[in-house]
Amino acid sequence: MKVAYIAGPYRANTINRTVENIRNAEKMAIKYWKKGYAVICPHKNTALFDGICPDETWLRGDIEIMKRCDLVVMVPGWETSQGSVTERDIAVKIGIKVVEP
């Protein structure tokens, strides 16, 4: 089974917007589960863990997981997220297929 990684904005100015970002990533994850992929959705893995560790800790860990995936799926609005831009750039650099549904 191929593995898809969901990349998109997480952080926001309000908790409501952060929850909305998590929900958007969740919807994309469900879409790819239905397509037959095993899906890693980092938004759900560390949802609302804010303040426990520096944000860089989460991003480094997510990138390690992403490197083992077959596909990176960009959630709409990814361009506004520095973390998502970094994830996309690394995926392209190491040859992981990137899609923008």
Model features per residue range: what roles?
Residues 1-101:
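Catalytic phosphate/metal-binding cores of nucleic-acid and nucleotide-processing enzymes, i.e., regions
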